[in-house]
C-alpha cells in the first residue's frame, strides 16, 4: 500500500566533507556503484561487501522503495536490499519512489543492510543510466578497491589517500554533499571548500550537470536537483 504523503526522516545536520579527514579521523571511502542484487548475492565481512575478491566499504545503489518502516530505526527496502537510515538530515520518500542510496554495508543479527548516508529521489530514466555507469566504472572497483584476504592487514594511510584521490567519483560525492548541505552555493564558495585545481572542479561540475545531479539556477550558482 502506498503512502499518501511523504515521510520525514530525521532533522537537519551539517555534513563534514573535507577531501582528506584529519589525522585520527576515519577515512571516507569511495562509494562504488553496484546493482542491488550484487548486495543481496555477496557476503558482508568486516563491514565491507565482498565483490570479486575486493572489499567495498561504501556502496551506491538505485532502485524502488518498498516496505517503509518508521520506528526506533527507520528502514525500508530498495529492490530487496534492506536500507536503514540513522542520519538527522531530513529525507522525504514514498512507497514506489526510485531512490539513489549511498551508504556503508553492515550486518545485524545475521541480516545484511546498508547504513544510508545520502538518499536522493530519481526517476525511471536513471535505471538505464545507472546500468551504463556500473559497466563503465566497474574496472575502478576491480583495480582500486581493497583486496579481500582472510588475514588482510589494514591499508596504510598513504594507500587509502592515494586510492581516494585517484577516483573521481569520491570527489564528485564530496561536491554533491557540500552543495546539498548548504542548499545553494557559488562557484567561488565551492572552490574554497574543496581543495582541487579549478580545471578539475569545472570538469566535475560539468559532469554533475550532465548527469542531472545539480543545476545552475543562476550563472555560477549551483543547487542539487
Swiss-Prot record:
<dbReference type="Pfam" id="PF01399">
    <property type="entry name" value="PCI"/>
</dbReference>
<dbReference type="InterPro" id="IPR036390">
    <property type="entry name" value="WH_DNA-bd_sf"/>
</dbReference>
<dbReference type="InterPro" id="IPR036388">
    <property type="entry name" value="WH-like_DNA-bd_sf"/>
</dbReference>
<dbReference type="InterPro" id="IPR000717">
    <property type="entry name" value="PCI_dom"/>
</dbReference>
<feature type="domain" description="PCI">
    <location>
        <begin position="166"/>
        <end position="214"/>
    </location>
</feature>
<protein>
    <recommendedName>
        <fullName>Uncharacterized protein MJ1654</fullName>
    </recommendedName>
</protein>
<dbReference type="InterPro" id="IPR012340">
    <property type="entry name" value="NA-bd_OB-fold"/>
</dbReference>
